[in-house]
Amino acid sequence: GTLLTAITEGLSAFESFTPLAVGIAWTLVGALLAGYLLLYRRGFPPFIPIGSADIRSFMRSADGLLISALVVMSCVIGLIAVIAPPTNEDSMSYHMARVRHWIQQQSVAHYPTHITRQLFSNPWAEFTIAHLFLLTGTDRLANCVQWFSMVGSLAAVSLIASRLGADKRGEVLAAVVAGTIPMGILQASSTQNDYTAAFWLACFCYVLLRIRDAPEVEGPPWAWISCLGLSVGLAIL
């Protein structure tokens, strides 16, 4: 999220927010990450095989049924997000409208408009949509920003429950309760940004609990402190 914001603002400063520039930027990011993994990683964690008997046993349990229902629901919402283009009023009036303006002027700078929320509303979700639009040449993936935020939020909620002392069933129930919020289901296949903000706030809460739980053993390392600040900053953005 921070890299995406930096790329967006950096390219916009030179009015170079174009498909070519964004593509080059993400290619460089991918190359740097691949180089880091090759040079500094000692090795990846060993793969732990899961037997078919274990899977069948889990699927027959109450937790397995709840997780299965949540996965099916998420897949259906994801399919709708990909198939159905953005059509709701918010998408047309400012979410997608500001994205098209930014792409047209090759910058996220302010522009003349009588719909002022295109200028002052939190822009991070639309930054992401703009990147997807520039990289693919279509708005087909615009709704996926909310959908991926929903999936990430459910994972974060489960981890938060674990940090608060819940057992495996408690983690599953936390994810199910969060995933079945009616408004969340409706918005997860749109370009609205509620789930995007919720995801970064959930990340902030998890990191905060992570630092709280192990201050003496590990100390709050700079990486976790940085994640704490960045997550709340991205939630506001």
What residues fall within each predicted segment?
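Short acidic/glycine- and proline-prone juxtamembrane loop motifs at membrane-interface regions
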Residues: 115, 186-196
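Extracytoplasmic catalytic/substrate-binding loops of multi-pass membrane glycan-assembly enzymes
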Residues: 84-98, 104-128, 136-140
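Membrane-interface transmembrane helices that cradle and orient dolichyl/undecaprenyl
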Residues: 165, 204-224
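Membrane-embedded, hydrophobic transmembrane alpha-helices
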Residues: 1-55
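Transmembrane-helix motifs of polytopic, lipid-linked glycan transferases
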Residues: 2, 30-39, 141-165, 203
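Membrane-interface alpha helices of multi-pass inner-membrane proteins
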Residues: 222-237
